[in-house]
UniProtKB/Swiss-Prot annotation:
NCBIfam families: PRK00405.1, rpoB. It comes from the Bacteria. It comes from Legionella pneumophila (strain Paris). Its EC number is 2.7.7.6. PROSITE patterns: RNA_POL_BETA. One of its GO terms (molecular function) is DNA binding. One of its GO terms (cellular component) is DNA-directed RNA polymerase complex. Keywords: DNA-directed RNA polymerase, Nucleotidyltransferase, Transcription, Transferase. DNA-dependent RNA polymerase catalyzes the transcription of DNA into RNA using the four ribonucleoside triphosphates as substrates. This is DNA-directed RNA polymerase subunit beta. Belongs to the RNA polymerase beta chain family.
């Protein structure tokens, strides 16, 4: 029985090999799970672990709530949504991958049908009938533990999308629209779903509106449609100036500020004193205004001319007669003033405008508005939206209402409402999802303010205006689309409910829902085939944010600004990692610490700073919240109490970098690596690399192929362990305990007692993945790194996956590199490698190819998989079993048969002789043709697995049965082990209960009244322990319970075995017309060879030019030959100096390992070794690694693992300094400049200068020459031109183009050229003739007319020109 100990400081794998860190900054917070963005999003979508009453209005729940209840057209019946539950998936992830199925769970929704009594006169009508039922709504794909989906047997990832946030955005055209370069401002209300509403200025400063980017209309039409009259519109947008007629003089109410900047058209005096303030013709300044305010002038007498041309703010009506003298927005004329005087109207309200900050835009717009009433405005909008349809009042009103004011058609969403309110200055963050009149008014007001110079336009590339849409949200949208389709069908059927007594199940057809979901996961632009080359590529793929996809940008339309690095990317999106090429800047990667908030905006963590003192409190800030804060960088100098020491601190504020005093600082970065993404954080000395090369380095690490033996990098960054454990490729312990059993294919753990809960098994069995094919044909294989009896904790790594070494990411190999030219073989980034690398299989990789053979039901009969193939010799069938399927372990080469298959041929007319032969010898096998699966050209390897899938209901062949047996044996083995451990646990408890108890009787020599001893128990069979009778009733009851537990265990195991058996034995659901599928997996070993692409982590890539014998390689004075020679000219111009520093530190790491190996070989004491390790790990007196927590055995294991070199970590932007590298080299007794004398292997002479030699981590990339090169003799031809196809996939030929023809013409090689252009290309007759000639041993050629010339003739004839060749 295992008992847990106190949580140790280091994990099981870490203790075996510590990585020495040079980081100066302590990590305040751990790096969050790297896949959390995917996992959390989908968890929130499904809400499976939440009770129905506690479910939030998101995900599936929100989709159902938004569509239901569905009412019938008559209103007499409705369907209501009660809740949903997800069932259990039929197959687990591994089985789904093998069988080519989707990993999904059935969705059952509880629907309530409410029928109202239509005959009742009451309102609301009384309920006549309620029926509830669980309705099956299709299958919902489930996310695996590592953030992927298995769709049709392949792993896929749904990439998050970065799209424009809903809300309102104000922008201008940058002067591009009008030739004068005038800025035209516009506003756009973007809903989450629904019509877009645009407001824009034209060059004449009128305001227009567009709905869904259609024809523009004056904005006043929209305002009239909302029910505003001209008077209301003017009062909303303008301040008014009131004018009174007193004693024949016009007095205006004076607000002095309004006169600023105007030129006085008359003298302005102080009424009381007559003092002149402004002379006629002078501009009114701030000084004049002060004087007016001082004199407390209330009104100003203005000449009549001053009023002419001003605009009326209100309608002018003669109250006695009701006669309209003038409309609001009319200009004041001489006639109008006379008419007003005649009618006794003594007061006029005018709108106040000026050219500076109170433009007359809305007034000008009203003047060009053709409509005069609300109805006319609605009709005008109807005509614009539905041109050609005759408008009616009802139709126009309904259309306008449906555009922006109905929840079904329009939704701003919570994010949109929050962004909208904040932008237009509404205090609350919440509000309706539809628009209101006030919303539209406030947008137009804000737009006019911006035009008037108050406020700024928005930056659409600011991360406060772009949000992330993750998997859960996208799936919810698709689900809603499906539900809306269902709703239409249900509405029609609901009217039949009363008459036909239907149930909810009969009304709802779930097909549209499952079709929408299937389409999204199967073919959406954002549901992508997972990049599985290595663990890092998988992690990066799941953390990717794309601006492309439905509702996003397109490559062609995206400009430079969208792609560029923005200041708000800091700590949210990586400025380095993005693809090269057309997608640059559109596809980004999340930064290491970034996460999304409830609104979908990317947040980054910051430490709170109070009065210049840094606290350990961490807050997440989005780009919106960050703007007004002063944020310092993480490497600011602090004292022991956390006070900032510098007088001026560099910080970020208002999206700018500036210097400020410590007391102003509000926040501080959490870590130096929070700027970059996962891939970039794995590049050591990133701070010394040019950004363009770092970009290549980040991207190329994702293409590194897993090698046969993974080797950890000597120089890393400390992120390796985190990436490996979060990626899901290694096996991580779910619970702590003791390793009970380990072999190559599984690990059995006996779990600690305190980590098991009632009803759970105390056994964890981890089945390892062995030689499994990844999406990119690389090999996924797991190897245990624990031994029987090891005590492990939860979270410890139990088995390494591909590209992991002792739980650390290991993408390549450490090679001894020399920077020097070597006979021109490293010209232009070529790489020269030693034969030893090939011999030691350092870069040998395993690739697994999947080849499929399908037997179908054809018109002529069924295809058959068999070993009886016509016209094939015995030797070709030697690798096949009696079922016609290749044996596992067979080594096959190109052209070998893997699966024998025959297809029926069409009946042919037989000659009399054939008829006779057939009559004598019976049915001949001539009616079938060989269509076997053969190994494609250029491929050879070993068969490692075969899967046979047989259609349900067909007889399985012997091979399929033997595969099933193996499968069952594996399941049986797991269950037996689990049962053994659980039985031992029960018997352990029984013996604990029985020992030293007084017995009243029992099997064997047990006398009543005697005590039970261990000897007695050892003699009696365990099964009979339950027959022992005991005085103590409580103990007897416990024994009874344990006995029942044992019985239940047996039943449970039987049930589980039978369930598994049923799954394994059942037939497969194959596509229509398919009878049987055989999948053969070939393991191909690829050694490194010239033409393969290699790279370091700093963007230093190259192609291998030659493999040199070890004895010819440059070597050091002690005889050690270098592994690889790189060109020194590749460093200065590329500015990736990080590779040189890595080389130096790598040399030190290896040298220290050599010193430790020497100490171990000399059998030095553990104390001496510990003292040396202290010097290495805690070089600057700071305790980074606590060696005291290791006992002597653990210390010696650690030292032994360091023989190959001491792994180092130099975190990005916080790495080793030049001085630290030198001190490490000195500690290892190596030259401090990292340069070594090298000797030429061929001559034995020393090279003139010392050479930089050290260890660099090199990767082999997934661009292998074997995949790119192929050879063709004959093959397929293009249909029209009859020329060979191109490319390896089509088994094509080499193009001999125009320029190549010129080259042969220049040499005068006429016959060679003729051969190239005729018999080797498209002379159909000539090429068959030469084939026959060669067979007959005659090597002459007889060229004819190339087919392409005939095509040309046909094309000329198509133009109506009669062209014919004259034959001599």
């Amino acid at each position: 029985m295992a008992v847990a100990e106190a949580k140790p400081q280091y994990s099981h794998a870490e203790k075996k090999r510590f990585r020495k860190s040079f980081g100066k900054q302590t990590d305040i917070m751990p790096i969050p799970n790297l896949l959390e963005i995917q996992l959390k999003s989908y968890r929130d979508f499904l809400q499976t672990d939440t009770k129905l009453s506690e479910q939030l209005n998101t995900g599936l729940h929100a989709a159902f709530s938004s569509v239901f209840p569905i009412e019938s057209f008559s209103g007499n019946a409705r369907l209501e949504y009660v809740g949903y539950k997800l069932g259990e998936p039929a197959f687990d992830v591994r089985e789904c991958k093998l069988r080519g199925l989707t990993y999904s769970a059935p969705l059952r929704v509880k629907i309530r049908l409410v029928v109202l009594d239509k005959d009742a006169s009451d309102d609301p009508k009384p309920i006549k009938d309620i029926r509830e039922q669980d309705v099956f709504m299709g299958e919902i794909p489930l996310m695996t533990d590592v953030g992927t989906f298995v769709v049709n047997g392949t792993e896929r990832v749904v990439v998050s999308q970065l799209h424009r946030s809903p809300g309102v955005i104000f922008e201008h055209d940058k002067g591009k629209t009008h030739s004068s370069g005038k800025l035209l401002y516009s506003a756009r209300i973007i809903p989450y779903r629904g019509s877009w509403l645009d407001f824009e200025f034209d060059p004449k400063d009128c305001v227009y509106v567009r709905i869904d980017r259609r024809r523009k209309l004056p904005v006043s039409i929209l305002l009239r449609a909302l029910g505003y009259e001209a008077e209301d519109i003017l009062s909303e947008f303008f301040e008014t100036t009131r004018c009174h007629l007193k004693n024949g003089e016009y007095h205006i109410d004076l607000i002095p500020q309004r006169l600023r900047g105007e030129i006085a058209s008359f003298d302005i005096h102080v009424p009381e004193t007559g003092e002149l303030i402004v002379e006629q013709g002078r501009r009114i300044t701030a000084r004049h205004i002060k004087q007016m305010e001082k004199s407390q002038m209330q009104d100003l007498v203005v000449p009549r001319d001053y009023l002419i041309g001003k605009t009326l703010a209100k309608n002018i009506i003669d109250t006695s007669t009701g006669e309209f003298l003038a409309q609001a927005n009319d200009e004041i004329t001489e006639e109008l003033l006379d008419a007003m005087a005649n009618h006794g109207i003594l007061q006029i309200d005018m709108i106040y405008t000026n050219d500076l900050d109170h433009g007359s835009y809305i007034s000008d717009t009203l003047k060009i508005d053709p409509t005069g009433s609300q109805l006319e405005a609605l009709v005008e909008i109807y005509r614009m939206m539905r041109p050609g349809e005759p408008p009616t009042k009802e139709a126009a009103e309904a259309l306008f209402k449906n555009l922006f004011f109905v929840e079904e058609r329009y939704d701003l969403s919570a994010v949109g409402r929050m962004k909208f309110n904040r932008r237009v200055g509404i205090k609350s963050d919440e509000g309706p999802g539809t628009l209101t009149k006030e919303d539209i008014l406030s947008v137009i007001k804000t737009l006019i303010d911006i035009r008037n110079g108050i406020g700024m336009v928005d930056d659409i590339d600011h991360l406060g205006n772009r949000r992330v849409r993750s998997v859960g949200e996208m799936t919810e949208n698709q689900f809603r689309v499906g539900l809306v389709r269902v709703e239409r069908a249900v509405k029609e059927r609901l009217s039949l409910v009363e008459s036909e007594n239907l149930m909810p199940q009969d009304l709802i057809n779930a097909k549209p829902v499952s079709a929408a979901i299937k389409e999204f996961f199967g073919s959406s632009q954002l549901s992508q085939f997972m990049d599985q080359v290595n663990p890092l590529s998988g992690v990066t793929h799941k953390r990717r944010v794309s601006a492309l996809g439905p509702g996003g940008l397109t490559r062609e339309r995206a400009g430079f600004e969208v792609r560029d690095v923005h200041t708000t990317h800091y700590g949210r999106v990586c400025p380095i990692e993005t693809p090269e090429g057309p997608n640059i800047g559109l596809i980004n990667s999340l930064s290491v610490y970034a996460r999304t908030n409830e609104y979908g905006f990317i947040e980054t963590p910051c430490r709170k700073v109070v009065n210049g003192r840094v606290t350990d409190e961490v807050e997440y800030l989005s780009a919106i919240e960050e703007v007004d804060q002063y944020i310092a960088q993480s490497n600011v100098e602090l004292d022991a109490q956390g006070n900032i020491l510098a007088d001026l601190v560099p910080c970020r504020h208002q999206n700018e970098f500036s210097l400020t005093t410590p007391d102003k600082i509000n926040y501080m970065d959490v870590s130096p690596k929070q700027i970059v993404s996962v891939a970039a954080s794995l590049i050591p000395f990133l701070e010394h690399d040019d950004a363009n090369r770092a970009l290549m380095g980040s991207n190329m690490q994702r293409q590194a192929v897993p090698t046969l033996r993974s080797e950890k990098p000597l120089v890393g960054t400390g992120m390796e362990r985190i990436v490996a454990s979060d990626s899901g490729v290694s096996v991580v312990a779910k619970r702590g305990g003791v390793i009970d059993l380990v072999d190559a294919s599984r690990i059995v753990v006996r779990v600690n007692d305190d980590e098991t809960t009632a009803g759970e098994t105390g056994v964890d069995i981890y089945n390892l993945t062995k030689y499994f094919r990844s999406n990119q044909d690389t090999c996924i294989n797991q190897r245990p790194i624990v031994s029987t009896g090891d005590r492990i904790q939860r979270g410890d790594v139990l088995a390494d996956g591909p590209c992991t070494d002792m739980g650390e990411l290991a993408l390549g190999q450490n090679l001894l590199v020399a920077f020097m030219p070597w006979n021109g073989y490293n010209f232009e980034d070529s790489i020269l490698i030693s034969e030893r690398i090939v011999h030691d299989d350092r870069f040998t990789t395993i690739h697994i190819e999947e080849l499929t053979c399908i037997a179908r039901d054809t018109k002529l009969g069924t295809e058959e998989i068999t070993a009886d193939i016509p016209n094939v010799g015995e030797s070709a069938l030697s690798n096949l079993d009696e079922s016609g399927v290749v044996y596992i372990g067979a080594e096959v080469k190109a052209g070998d048969i893997l699966v024998g298959k025959v297809t029926p041929k069409g009946e042919t007319q037989l000659t009399p002789e054939e008829k006779l032969l057939r009559a004598i010898f019976g049915e001949k096998a001539s009616d079938v043709k060989d269509s076997s699966l053969r190994v494609p050209s250029g491929m050879n390897g070993t068969v490692i697995d075969v899967q046979v899938f047989t259609r349900d209901g067909l007889e399985k062949d012997a091979r399929a049965k033997s595969i099933e047996e193996e499968h069952l044996a594996r399941v049986r083995k797991d269950l037996i082990d689990e049962r053994r451990i659980r039985e031992e646990d029960i018997y352990h408890r029984v013996s604990h209960l029985l020992l030293d108890k007084v017995a009243t009787g029992g099997p064997g020599s047990l006398k009543p009244g005697s005590k039970i001893t261990q000897d007695y128990l050892d003699k009696v069979e365990r099964e009979k322990w339950f027959d022992i009778r005991i005085e103590d009733d409580a103990v007897s009851q416990q024994l009874e319970q344990l006995s029942k537990q044992l019985e239940l265990l047996t039943k449970e195991m039987e049930k589980r075995f039978n369930d598994s058996r049923k799954k394994i034995i059942q037939g497969d659901d194959l596509a229509p017309g398919v009878l049987k599928i055989v999948k053969v997996y070939l393991a191909v070993k690829r050694r490194i060879q010239p033409g393969d692409k290699m790279a370091g982590r700093h963007g230093n890539k190259g192609v291998i030019s030659i493999v040199v014998p070890v004895e010819d390689m440059p070597h050091m004075e002690d005889g050690t030959a270098v592994d690889i020679v790189l060109n020194p000219l590749g460093v200065p111009s590329r500015m990736n100096i990080g590779q040189v520093l890595e080389t130096h530190l790598g040399l030190a790491a290896k040298g220290l390992g050599r010193k430790i190996a020497q100490m171990l070989d000399e059998r030095q004491t553990p104390e001496a070794i510990k003292a040396y390790l202290e010097k290495i790990y805690n070089h600057d007196g700071v305790q980074r690694v606590n060696l005291k927590c290791l006992n002597d055995d653990e210390l010696m294991t650690l030292a032994d693992n360091l023989r190959a070199g001491v792994p180092m970590a130099t975190p990005v932007f916080d790495g080793a300094t030049e001085q630290e590298i030198k001190s490490m080299l000195q500690l290892a007794d190596l030259p401090a400049d990292g340069k070594t004398v090298l000797i030429d292997g061929r001559t034995g002479n020393k090279f003139d200068n010392t050479v930089t030699v050290g260890y660099m981590y090199m990767l082999k990339l997934n661009h292998l020459v074997d995949d790119k090169m192929h050879a063709r003799s004959t093959g397929s031809y293009s249909l029209v031109t009859q020329q060979p196809l191109g490319g390896k996939a089509q088994f094509g030929g080499q193009r001999f183009g125009e320029m190549e023809v010129w080259a042969l013409e220049a040499y005068g090689a006429a016959y060679t050229l003729q051969e190239m252009l005729t018999v080797k290309s498209d002379d159909v007759g000539g090429r068959t003739k030469i084939y026959k000639n060669i067979v007959d041993g005659d090597h002459r050629m007889d060229p004819g007319m190339p087919e392409s010339f005939n095509v040309l003739l046909k094309e000329i004839r198509a133009l109506g020109i009669d062209i014919e060749l004259e034959h001599d």
